[in-house]
Amino acid sequence: MNTILAQQIANEGGVEAWMMAQQHKSLLRFLTCGSVDDGKSTLIGRLLHDTLQIYEDQLSSLHNDSKRHGTQGEKLDLALLVDGLQAEREQGITIDVAYRYFSTEKRKFIIADTPGHEQYTRNMATGASTCDLAILLIDARKGVLDQTRRHSFISTLLGIKHLVVAINKMDLVDYREETFARIREDYLTFAEQLPGDLDIRFVPLSALEGDNVAAQSANMRWYSGPTLLEVLETVDIQRAVDRQPMRFPVQYVNRPNLDFRGYAGTLASGSVKVGERIKVLPSGVESSVARIVTFDGDKEEACAGEAITLVLNDDIDISRGDLLLAANETLAPARHAAIDVVWMAEQPLAPGQSYDVKLAGKKTRARIEAIRYQIDINNLTQRDVESLPLNGIGLVEMTFDEPLALDIYQQNPVTGGLIFIDRLSNVTVGAGMVRELDERGATPPVEYSAFELELNALVRRHFPHWDARDLLGDKHGAA
């Protein structure tokens, strides 16, 4: 058994007490990225090893694997803890996104180890989409490379505000302070071009030797800052979704019997309370919250990130893909938008093409109208292109087949992020982040026939309990 885990359970007074303590720890999701062979997998292996998260049988297996596939001579190849695919071990690289979990006394962590090779940039974007922080590894011998810039830009494009620049392999440059200072200055010069208000920190370390990973290095006394683990344990993650208005995408209509009808999903942003008035988009019909049902029982209030089922006081038409928000909120459905796209398919993205797009449970069709520009990752300049190639990043104008309730991605990743799906193969071919909502996206006023208006008036007069909307709105009242 993992000795540190056994000790923690004993200190907490049993398994149940330990599990309760784990539930109240904050969770940090982070990814490691950078150029190929910068030591990302080795760093994660070092974190797991030095925080005593490796079981005895895993350690024994690691000794054997290091002899067969290792790249560190007689030393343990800690990268093998993460590189699980046979092709990864044979080539000594990371191909797929590998997820690992560990915890300390202060915090819980979920790590995404992403590929460094350019042809796997799409995998890196997938790993970054759910993370709060990015560790950008830089080989102290090579400095800032193109792939470092690419991963930095993708991370910030996907809404990550906290960047930890880990300058690795300091042991191979004799732990020289001037090397660290030069790379730090080079990266800060590049970072001036990155979008958003970023929190950037620098840590010199050696993942292979363990310097400044979980313990202070005796070889770099010139560095007085925190270790990498201390940064991860103490960084204050302010999630934008906590401060945004309530958004609840319906993922599933829960109807186990005739007496229960609920709408299941994860609260994307804001909070919702029992009794609160809500509005359904795109229909615009209003109701109020009767119950908030969870696995652990009913609640009076739910916050962003919680998986809940909402029961409403009225039987109204709601289906998968609809969006619930506060009744006093205004969110005009849009048919036109400018989307930041990370393209993931061999066939380039070009104007005139149509794809299925999926947004928070809603699936519809979209047409590519124009490509405004592609980003040159080397210098973050914009260039005109006729198509967007594999791993290309650019700003694209799109038109949806139907109006969609969208937010700007930087404000709400759930209702502002979408994926492109090939209509023939059903393969995901791209990821998109809403940058702008076109003013043409507002739904135009609907012209109703005389029959529709008369029928609406009849229903409201004789069936007021149906809560039918007045089609004439303010004009009717004024008349």
From Swiss-Prot:
Output the InterPro entries linked to this UniProt entry.
Answer: CysN_GTP-bd, CysN_II, CysN_NoDQ_III, G_TR_CS, GTP-eEF1A_C, P-loop_NTPase, Small_GTP-bd, SO4_adenylTrfase_lsu
Listed EC numbers? 2.7.7.4
Q: Which residues form the tr-type G domain?
A: 25-239
Pfam families documented for this protein: GTP-eEF1A_C, GTP_EFTU
Q: Which reaction does it catalyse?
A: sulfate + ATP + H(+) = adenosine 5'-phosphosulfate + diphosphate
* PROSITE patterns to which the protein is assigned, alphabetical: G_TR_1, G_TR_2
Region described as G1: spans on this chain: 34-41
Cite the residue spans of the region called G5.
206-208
User: Pathway involvement?
Assistant: Sulfur metabolism; hydrogen sulfide biosynthesis; sulfite from sulfate: step 1/3
Q: Where does GTP bind?
A: 34-41, 113-117, 168-171
Q: What family does the database annotate? A: Belongs to the TRAFAC class translation factor GTPase superfamily. Classic translation factor GTPase family. CysN/NodQ subfamily.
Checking NCBIfam families in the record gives: CysN, PRK05124.1, small_GTP
Q: What does this protein do?
A: With CysD forms the ATP sulfurylase (ATPS) that catalyzes the adenylation of sulfate producing adenosine 5'-phosphosulfate (APS) and diphosphate, the first enzymatic step in sulfur assimilation pathway. APS synthesis involves the formation of a high-energy phosphoric-sulfuric acid anhydride bond driven by GTP hydrolysis by CysN coupled to ATP hydrolysis by CysD.
Q: Describe the subunit structure.
A: Heterodimer composed of CysD, the smaller subunit, and CysN.
HAMAP family documented for this protein: Sulf_adenylyltr_sub1
Q: What is this protein called?
A: Sulfate adenylyltransferase subunit 1
- What organism is recorded for this protein? Salmonella schwarzengrund (strain CVM19633)
